[in-house]
């Protein structure tokens, strides 16, 4: 996961990271919900989700249709069990990771409901069982189906296996509603897990990893006898469809479940204050090691069901409940070395090589060190961390399985009398390509400036180069780019942008013909070559955007193209721009530097990124090869349009029925307007279609003019 703060991400970096996060979270959802073999800890997964949500909040225009924030769980993986559509969706819960998060949750409940006295709303608190969510349906008192959560909408029918769990009644007592869906968690007790593993070991079979995965796998057995032998258990805590509600509170419903014969958790209690909830959270945390089942937090719910109804739901979670997660587990080990990894955006990330240690049941050999400052003992705001202690090779360190894809080092334990190693010197060159690694002012991350030549960044750079708003080469999708990049045959490989345009020529005299490779054919290869040839002349702003210069996203590429009009002029400016000397207030930088800063919307950060890019010899070599194949077209000088929206900032929101978002954007720019992805005080006009939500509300709040799509067409004279 990236260590760059969300506020410092460029639009290009944010879009790329959201794409990676969507793929990663979907992958881990499938492993956890559908295949019962997770690769990362719950804390690491939560960190991915939090990072995704933070980026979406900062870049609302980039929210993807397949965003993890709109999805619950994973679709059933195999057709072994028949699908079951839940009468009411089985949603997930939002997470709290601190006392402050819990106070914010309770505060949000009071704010939403409005004008209720303090401490007048009761909340229940119960352990969050680490098992498999299950919905059990009864009709006229008889168990008719059991279904897993699946993706929240559709689960798997595991009725035969559910019937083998002794703690789940096959019949409900007389007087139960005609339709009842009891929901809860199927789990395996720790003691039963240890007994099962001892039995497997005695039989010379492979043992299981943990109780949660074992319970999930046991429930998906084709032979119900196998499920029966695994001694699965159940806690009831929620419900789905009910033809009649037998109680009016959360606690009352759970008590009804107990009376019907379901096991319910004895640690569930009700409180009227945040302090009571937090005290119970800590009490359960203290009792956690002695429990015979795994838990990973405490769930808080508004107790009154009428208030739950008023609070309602977000897209994938209820407003009236939250899961307060337990902190990560820690262990002490030795730091044996520090490796530098180069990410797809050029960030140099230090990774600790550790003496192997078991943390929370997982053997850990590597941990993240975040960045250069973290190793030195400096925090994100320049404050000392770990009491200012730096991290050195040979140190005893505390490792925590927490909010990163790999664990992290959280502290150093200095041993009296033991001589420490030398302070770690962070590299100033990229280990992947040898280019300079620079650190921008105000950033903790050091980045490779190799860009187009760096192998660690190459795949991502080429994907960006051929993307829709850059060179837009049809037939070079994600899979095709990876295929060409990994190809060892010189007649097939694409390692730099210029290689795309020499592919056809290299193929002419090659024995390895592209059309003979699986996935390609004569027709598709011809289309690919035609698509490539169609981009040998390219608009200047697309060319600049395609280079992937840091901070030069689509908007800034257009600003630079309109300012310099030709690539020759832009290149000359980039090579002649010299920033002011650091600390010299009288130095304003070169004339070319001052001219670049004079371009609307281009500040010193963007200008420095351009200068760094062109200052790297490797990049100039790659550009020379590319320009031998491609011609950037001069930009037409903008003339006054006389349009009523000229010079204004426009935001489009909601569903557009007469044009796509790209068409709307192009139309606005054609009339001299600028478009933005979010509403702010700088917004002049909002065009709102059906389904407009937060942006429309923000515009109304700020008093910004709002019109519909038809009025927009009339306004710009294209009706």
Swiss-Prot record:
InterPro entries: BRCT_dom, BRCT_dom_sf, DisA/LigA_HHH, DNA_ligase, DNA_ligase_AS, DNA_ligase_CS, DNAligase_adenylation, DNAligase_N. PROSITE patterns: BRCT (PS50172), DNA_LIGASE_N1 (PS01055), DNA_LIGASE_N2 (PS01056). The keyword Magnesium applies. Its EC number is 6.5.1.2. GO terms for cellular component: cytosol. Its cofactor is Mg(2+); Mn(2+). Gene3D superfamilies: 5' to 3' exonuclease, C-terminal subdomain, 6.20.10.30, BRCT domain, DNA ligase/mRNA capping enzyme, Helix hairpin bin, Nucleic acid-binding proteins. One of its GO terms (biological process) is DNA replication. Keywords: DNA damage, DNA repair, DNA replication, Ligase, Magnesium, Manganese, Metal-binding, NAD, Zinc. The keyword Zinc applies. NAD(+) binds at residues 42-46, 92-93, 126, 149, 185, 301, 325. Transmembrane segments: none annotated. SUPFAM superfamilies: BRCT domain, DNA ligase/mRNA capping enzyme, catalytic domain, Nucleic acid-binding proteins, RuvA domain 2-like. The active site is at 128 (n6-amp-lysine intermediate). It catalyses: NAD(+) + (deoxyribonucleotide)n-3'-hydroxyl + 5'-phospho-(deoxyribonucleotide)m = (deoxyribonucleotide)n+m + AMP + beta-nicotinamide D-nucleotide. Pfam families: BRCT (PF00533), DNA_ligase_aden (PF01653), DNA_ligase_OB (PF03120), DNA_ligase_ZBD (PF03119), HHH_2 (PF12826). Residues 640-719 form the BRCT domain. GO terms for molecular function: DNA ligase (NAD+) activity; metal ion binding. Zn(2+) binds at residues 430, 433, 448, 454. Belongs to the NAD-dependent DNA ligase family. LigA subfamily. DNA ligase that catalyzes the formation of phosphodiester linkages between 5'-phosphoryl and 3'-hydroxyl groups in double-stranded DNA using NAD as a coenzyme and as the energy source for the reaction. It is essential for DNA replication and repair of damaged DNA. NCBIfam families: dnlj, PRK07956.1. This is DNA ligase. The lineage of its organism: Bacteria, Pseudomonadati, Pseudomonadota, Alphaproteobacteria, Hyphomicrobiales.
């Amino acid at each position: 996961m990236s260590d760059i703060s969300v506020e410092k991400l460029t639009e290009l970096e944010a879009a790329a990271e959201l794409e990676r996060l969507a793929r990663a979270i979907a992958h881990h959802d499938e492993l956890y919900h559908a295949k019962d073999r997770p690769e990362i800890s719950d804390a690491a997964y939560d960190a991915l989700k939090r990072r995704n949500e933070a980026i979406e909040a900062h870049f609302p225009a980039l929210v993807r249709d397949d965003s993890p924030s709109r999805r619950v769980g994973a679709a059933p993986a195999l057709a072994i069990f028949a699908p079951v559509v839940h009468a009411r969706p089985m949603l997930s819960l939002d997470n709290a990771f601190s006392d402050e998060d819990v106070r914010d949750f309770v505060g949000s409940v009071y704010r939403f409901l409005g004008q209720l006295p303090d401490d007048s709303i009761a909340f229940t608190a119960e352990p969050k069982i680490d098992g498999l969510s299950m919905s059990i349906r009864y009709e006229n008192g008889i168990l008719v189906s059991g279904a897993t959560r699946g993706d929240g909408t559709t689960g798997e029918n595991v009725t035969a296996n559910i019937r083998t769990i002794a703690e789940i009644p096959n019949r409900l007592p007389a007087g139960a509603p005609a339709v009842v869906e009891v929901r809860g968690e199927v789990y395996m007790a720790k003691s039963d897990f240890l007994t099962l593993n001892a039995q497997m070991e005695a039989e010379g079979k492979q043992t299981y990893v943990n109780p949660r995965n074992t319970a999930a796998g046991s429930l998906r057995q084709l032979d119900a006898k196998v499920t029966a032998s695994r001694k699965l258990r159940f806690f009831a805590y929620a419900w789905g469809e009910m033809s009649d509600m037998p109680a009016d509170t959360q606690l009352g419903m759970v008590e009804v479940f107990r009376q019907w014969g379901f096991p319910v958790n004895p640690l569930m209690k009700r409180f009227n204050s945040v302090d009571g909830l937090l005290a119970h959270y800590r009490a359960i945390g203290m009792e956690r090691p002695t429990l015979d089942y795994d838990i990973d937090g405490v769930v808080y719910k508004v107790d009154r069901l009428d208030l739950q109804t008023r609070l309602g739901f977000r897209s994938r979670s209820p407003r009236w409940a939250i899961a307060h997660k337990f902190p990560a587990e820690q262990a002490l080990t030795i730091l044996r070395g520090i490796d530098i990894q180069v990410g797809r955006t050029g960030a140099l990330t230090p990774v600790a090589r550790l003496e192997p240690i078991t943390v929370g049941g997982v053997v850990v050999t590597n941990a993240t060190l975040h960045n250069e400052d973290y190793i030195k003992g400096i925090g994100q705001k320049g404050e000392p961390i770990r009491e200012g202690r730096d991290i050195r090779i040979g140190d005893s360190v505390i490792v925590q399985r927490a909010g990163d894809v790999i664990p992290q080092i959280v502290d150093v334990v200095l041993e009296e009398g033991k001589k420490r190693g030398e302070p770690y010197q962070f590299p100033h060159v990229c280990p992947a390509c040898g280019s300079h690694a620079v650190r921008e002012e105000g950033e903790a991350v050091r980045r490779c400036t190799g860009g187009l030549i760096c192998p660690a960044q190459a795949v991502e750079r080429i994907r960006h180069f051929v993307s829709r708003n850059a060179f837009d080469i049809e037939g070079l999708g994600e899979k095709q780019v990876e295929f060409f990049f990994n190809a060892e045959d010189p007649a097939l490989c694409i390692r730099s942008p210029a290689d795309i345009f020499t592919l056809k020529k290299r193929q002419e005299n090659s024995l390895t013909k592209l059309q003979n490779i699986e996935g390609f054919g004569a027709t598709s290869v011809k289309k690919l070559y035609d698509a490539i040839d169609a981009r040998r002349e390219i608009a200047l702003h697309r060319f600049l955007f395609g280079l992937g210069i840091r901070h030069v996203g689509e908007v800034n590429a257009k600003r630079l193209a309109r300012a310099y009009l030709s690539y020759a002029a832009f290149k000359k400016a980039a090579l002649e721009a010299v920033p002011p000397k650091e600390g010299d207030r009288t130095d304003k930088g070169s004339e070319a530097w001052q001219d670049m800063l004079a371009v609307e919307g281009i500040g010193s950060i963007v200008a420095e990124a351009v200068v760094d890019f062109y200052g790297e010899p490797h990049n100039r070599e790659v550009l020379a090869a590319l320009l031998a194949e491609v011609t950037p077209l001069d930009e037409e000088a903008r003339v006054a349009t006389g349009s009523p929206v000229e010079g204004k900032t426009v935001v489009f929101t909601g569903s557009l029925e007469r044009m796509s978002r790209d068409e709307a954007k192009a139309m606005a720019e054609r009339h001299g307007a600028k478009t933005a992805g979010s509403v702010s005080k700088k917004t002049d006009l909002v065009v709102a279609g059906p389904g407009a939500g937060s942006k429309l509300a923000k515009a109304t709040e700020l008093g910004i003019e709002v019109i519909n799509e038809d009025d927009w067409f009339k306004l710009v004279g294209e009706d």
